[in-house]
């Protein structure tokens, strides 16, 4: 680019102005110079005379009111907004020419002139009696510096925005699809995923697609091969945590959020109205407080993988029996051995139940009620699970393995033995996994006491709705495990139905075992331990009266009294175990 001196630059500008003014047939604008260009500043002791093309002459000075700060204005330029367009400037061809003043960087500026690093021409404007100064378009040899000016303005704009929220460019974080590692378009079905995987999962859960993997259910799913195997793609969707109801809480519609606020306000008003009732110390929590606390229960916010991990960690330790190989079995010795083992397992069962997600959120009444209804079913499914690897035998403890012939020494025990062995064979045929087992055991705990008999003398559960929600959460976890194993949708439905049918069979075995244990108690064959006796009496109380053959009225009355006392004793044992656990944690 040709370099120009200051004098030649002014001459060149005069030539440009003359060329433009010739098209309008107007005389050329002349600027009288009294000193060199490098020494020309706007000073307080200087006045200038400018000859306008129309022939009018105006005198002005910096001390005159025409340059007061109230009348001086700067018209915004297009470059102030980072644009290279010159549409914001008035050309000499579009408006009558105005006097031009060249301002150069100097140590003493007039206080109302904007600083620039280079010479910038300004036009004087006369608008409704007030004068203003507007920056003109820079000539071609100033264009390289305009990029720097735009850059500095952008920096000032960004620095001003730092006081508020960050810009979209700084806050936007690149996320990738959890299934195929493509760029994620948003948070869909509980995970960050792309549009393709979101649409595929939506089609899969809405339709009845029985995908089959042509290989070994281990296909690689990435951006380029995600369409090669639908079965493995759906399996990976479940593995990364996709679920039907997985939506972000902050993405709910305005109507949903409005209804939520209205419900919370109504709950707060109800809480204030009943504040006097809440101050009274009661054994059971108020239903209003329980309802409010269950909204944000941690158990309902767990993912499938988190639920499985929590259930596996909650598993109780193995309990050894007091079996003596040198002592032969008879009815009394075997029943004593088994009841002692069951009594010690009950203590671990209570600790296990308190670690099941959502169980401790229930009232004390509901916790005791569920344990009293399900304790023998839980013991039996644990026995069946341990016996899977021992065909024809039952592993009651690591040091107590019994077969069918050994069970014949106890009257009525063979029938129960056969049902337990058949259930273990069914588990073995289905290849039941440990994760599925812990889910089934938790379902038994929460489901056994939900449907109480109308003839039951005890109060029903207080938080059935919340228990059903936790049950749904565990059932969804069970379905997630089946989908993760690579089963088709039809196979998942079939396996889930088979497992739930086995639970009804375990319930039948529990009823048979309860009747047998109660008969042993009535015959005084074996003394029952305290906790086991309480559980037995409480379970008899939960059963309908029609199930007993012909019990006498006095026996029923005594049983009711014993069971009521047993229930209170179990509550005290439960509370004492809690206090002991809290004391251990404190120590």
Curated annotation (Swiss-Prot):
Hinge, as annotated region: 243-302
Pfam families per UniProt: ESR1_C, Hormone_recep, Oest_recep, zf-C4
One CC-aspect GO term: cytoplasm
Chain segments carrying region Disordered: 248-277
GO biological process: muscle cell development; positive regulation of gene expression
Segments crossing the lipid bilayer: none
Similarity comment text for this entry: Belongs to the nuclear hormone receptor family. NR3 subfamily.
Protein name as it appears in the record: Estrogen receptor
Phylogenetic classification of the source organism: Eukaryota, Metazoa, Chordata, Craniata, Vertebrata
């Amino acid at each position: 680019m040709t370099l120009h001196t200051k004098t030649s630059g002014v001459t060149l500008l005069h030539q440009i102005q003359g060329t433009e003014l010739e098209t309008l047939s107007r005389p050329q604008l002349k600027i009288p110079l009294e000193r060199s260009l490098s020494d020309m500043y706007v000073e307080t002791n200087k006045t200038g005379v400018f000859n306008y093309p129309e022939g009018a002459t105006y005198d002005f000075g910096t001390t005159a009111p025409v340059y007061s700060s109230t009348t001086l204005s700067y018209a915004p330029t297009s470059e102030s907004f980072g644009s290279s367009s010159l549409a914001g400037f008035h050309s000499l061809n579009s408006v009558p020419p105005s006097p031009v003043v060249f301002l150069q960087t100097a140590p003493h500026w007039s206080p109302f002139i904007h600083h620039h690093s280079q010479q910038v021409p300004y036009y004087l404007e006369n608008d409704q009696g007030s004068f203003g100064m507007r920056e003109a378009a820079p000539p071609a040899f100033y264009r390289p510096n305009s990029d720097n000016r735009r850059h500095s303005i952008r920096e000032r704009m960004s620095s001003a925005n730092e006081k508020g929220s960050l810009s979209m460019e700084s806050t936007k974080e690149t996320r990738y699809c959890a299934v195929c590692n493509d760029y994620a378009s948003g948070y869909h079905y509980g995970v960050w995923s792309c549009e393709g995987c979101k649409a595929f999962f939506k089609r899969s859960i809405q339709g009845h697609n029985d995908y089959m993997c042509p290989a070994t259910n281990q296909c690689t799913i990435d951006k380029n091969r995600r369409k090669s195997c639908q079965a493995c793609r759906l399996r990976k969707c479940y593995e990364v945590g996709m679920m039907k109801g997985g939506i972000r809480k902050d993405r709910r519609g305005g109507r949903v959020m409005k209804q939520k606020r209205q419900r919370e306000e109504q709950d707060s008003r109800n809480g204030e109205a009943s504040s006097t009732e809440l101050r009274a110390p009661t054994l059971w929590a108020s239903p209003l407080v329980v309802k409010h606390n269950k909204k944000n229960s941690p158990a309902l916010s767990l993912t499938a993988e988190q639920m499985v991990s929590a259930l596996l960690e909650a598993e109780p330790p193995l309990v050894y029996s007091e079996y003596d190989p040198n002592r032969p079995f008879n009815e009394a010795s075997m029943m004593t051995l088994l009841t002692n083992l069951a009594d010690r397992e009950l203590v671990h069962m209570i600790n296990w139940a308190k670690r099941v997600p959502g169980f401790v959120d229930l009232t004390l009444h509901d916790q005791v009620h569920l344990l009293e209804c399900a304790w023998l079913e839980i013991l039996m499914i644990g026995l069946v699970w341990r016996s899977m690897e021992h065909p024809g035998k039952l592993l009651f403890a690591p040091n107590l393995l019994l077969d069918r012939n050994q069970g014949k020494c106890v009257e009525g025990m063979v029938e129960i033995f056969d049902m337990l062995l058949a259930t273990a064979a069914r588990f073995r045929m289905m290849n039941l996994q440990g994760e599925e087992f812990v889910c089934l055991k938790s379902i038994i705990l929460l489901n056994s006491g939900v449907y109480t008999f109308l003839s039951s003398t005890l109060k029903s559960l207080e938080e059935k709705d919340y228990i059903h929600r936790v049950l749904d959460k565990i059932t969804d976890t069970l379905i997630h495990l089946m989908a993760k194993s690579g089963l088709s949708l039809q196979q998942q439905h079939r396996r889930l139905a088979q497992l739930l049918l086995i639970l009804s069979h375990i319930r039948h075995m529990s009823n048979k075992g309860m009747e047998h244990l109660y008969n042993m108690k009535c015959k005084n064959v074996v003394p029952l331990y305290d906790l086991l006796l309480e559980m037995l009496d409480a379970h008899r109380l939960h059963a309908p009266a029609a199930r007993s053959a012909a019990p006498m009225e006095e026996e029923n009355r005594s049983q009711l009294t014993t069971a009521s006392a047993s229930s209170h004793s179990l509550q005290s044992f439960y509370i004492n175990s809690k206090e002991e656990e809290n004391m251990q944690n404190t120590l």
